[in-house]
From Swiss-Prot:
Record has Protease as a keyword: no
UniProt xrefs under HAMAP family: ProA
GO cellular component: cytoplasm
Source organism (scientific name): Corynebacterium efficiens (strain DSM 44549 / YS-314 / AJ 12310 / JCM 11189 / NBRC 100395)
Source organism, top-level taxon: Bacteria
EC number: 1.2.1.41
Entries under NCBIfam families matching the protein: PRK00197.1, proA
The protein's annotated pathway: Amino-acid biosynthesis; L-proline biosynthesis; L-glutamate 5-semialdehyde from L-glutamate: step 2/2
Region named Disordered: 1-21
Official protein name in the record: Gamma-glutamyl phosphate reductase
Catalytic activity: L-glutamate 5-semialdehyde + phosphate + NADP(+) = L-glutamyl 5-phosphate + NADPH + H(+)
Keywords: Amino-acid biosynthesis, Cytoplasm, NADP, Oxidoreductase, Proline biosynthesis
Similarity field: Belongs to the gamma-glutamyl phosphate reductase family.
Amino acid sequence: MTAQTSSDVTDQKTDLTRESERDEVLAKATLAKKVAPEIAQLGTGVKNQILLAAAEALLERSAEIIEANSRDIAAGRESGMAESLIDRLALDEGRIEGIAGGLRQVAGLTDPVGEVLQGRVMENGIQMRQVRVPLGVMGMVYEARPNVTVDAFGLALKSGNVALLRGSSTAVHSNTTLVGILQDVLATFDLPRETVQLLPCATRESVQDLITARGLVDVVIPRGGAGLINAVVMGATVPTIETGTGNCHFYIDGDVDVDSAIAMLINGKTRRCSVCNATETALIDSALPDVDKLRVVRALQDAGVTVHGRVAELEAFGATDVVEATENDWDSEYLSFDIAVAVVDGVDAAIEHIEKYSTHHTEAIATNNVFTAQRFADHVDAAAVMINASTAFTDGEQYGMGAEIGISTQKLHARGPMALPELTSTKWILQGTGHTRP
């Protein structure tokens, strides 16, 4: 009989963990599917009461949340997690107040469920109407942002959906505590705790279990970096809504108010450099005077931004301290104080560059020429096109839509900020009086 090695034992433990995770994901998805019809029928008043109660519960139990979060932060630092990621992970009293405020905001939004989108009486007398209905079981796959746990719950509940949440293992203590609090609130309303459930995250394969649970899960929404999103979209058999990465471009035309263009560019790059609507590439028209090209580059550098570009191209008009760009720079969503800068020969060259490297999130132009602006808007393929405005405006709240679950860069079902209406489908209801079709 051959003795087991430590490697054999480790493999067995891994196999058992995988089997346990798979069973847990499918069991929770089955329970979610079972309770979904009940949640779909909740009235607006009840949903709003739950959201407001959840906001209060988060504040009342903030010490519990912060303690759990501190364990995640300690583990993150021990593993060498970057401080920028630690910042995304961290929760304090102020951030918890912001999360609670988000739930209150959702409570104040119009309930999309039951909204009649169109209706008419057919020639044969049948009354027909199209109404909004919940999607059903909504799966979320996301990275180390505990606020997404609560945001997803709030938006799912208000739109009549059940939430299956697969967060990052780096936020497991925070997410477990948050979901426990939300489930406790649901229980006080005699509603199933399975309305929101946290899925296991010990292995990456649990994501695959969720995104292939066709028949149990109605939609999966990935939210995070390009690697996560691509893995979900490419591996899913469940329908997905792609919240894309943001390699956002800002084109400065030759006919432009340079001061205004610089202000918009700096705002888009530095307001919050770690979000998907941050400007990542600046394209400068070759027709812009060299002195103004230099002003653009220096303004970025003065704001603390590292400029990447073709050094010879930028040095030709006096720029210094430029990092030589590689092909990867034009593709990059930096999410940092870095930007790629290139000189292009007019709006058509800018459009061509954007078409090659865009993630179809947000693209912007600064120009005084209405015809150039219209050409840019007509030919750029993106969820949002900004004309003389910062890329930072791609946001559900800025659009007047309220809270959002993400920014969709796909073309089917939803595109742009995904708020409550985008978390619903529609149903056609036809009412006759004994009609039969000849």
